[in-house]
Amino acid sequence: MKFPDFIFVGVVLANLVLVGYLGIGDYQRGRLVADSQQNGEQIVAWFENFALKFQDGSAISPQSCIPISEEAPGQKGAKINTWKSCVEDLYGNDGPFHQYTNLLIPKAPAYAAKCDKHELNSSGAFIFEKLTANPAGPPSAGPMELGEKLLGGINIRLSLCDTGYYLIKIGEFKL
């Protein structure tokens, strides 16, 4: 074997090592995205259970997530809960989602307003979107603003912002 043959074999081995390293990294990120999706499915199930408890009149916690009905009598002057207070209680230390974190970027928040390439911390975050009925077609989706009032019957979609800053739709629920 001549010297150029050794260089060729060295380059081939280096490429194999690089492909293996990149493949392992992609697999690990994919596993974290799949784990986040499972966490999101549990969040959707929790909200569906929350809605059932609300309809039955059972005790509900946290109180800050209880929507107010627009048609219900006797609720004039009642405090209207906002999305900010609800999501802070849900992800707070005593909230049901306190164990859910951003698995892709552990120092980033677990939820974000939108999936944005310019907001690097939104990768791996849960995105809550308000769905608005559209008579001409499918509902339009927009971010749940922190000041959004929680009214009964509001439709919300939960998505996950993946590593490429694209939304992975997990599920929809109704408050």
Which residues does each predicted region cover?
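Generic low-complexity segments that are intrinsically disordered, proline-rich and/or Lys/Arg-biased
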Residues: Q63, I68, G74, F97, ...
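Amphipathic alpha-helical segments typified by the pilin-like N-terminal helix
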Residues: M1-A45
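Short, surface-exposed interaction loops/tails
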Residues: E119-L175
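Hydrophobic beta-strand residues in large extracellular and virion-surface proteins
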Residues: I43, F47, I156-L158
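Short, glycine/small-hydrophobic-rich surface segments
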Residues: F47-T101
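Residue-level signal for mature regions of secreted extracellular proteins and peptides
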Residues: K76-I80, K107-A108, I154
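Non-catalytic regulatory appendages
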Residues: N81-Y91, T101, Y111-K117, F126-I127, ...
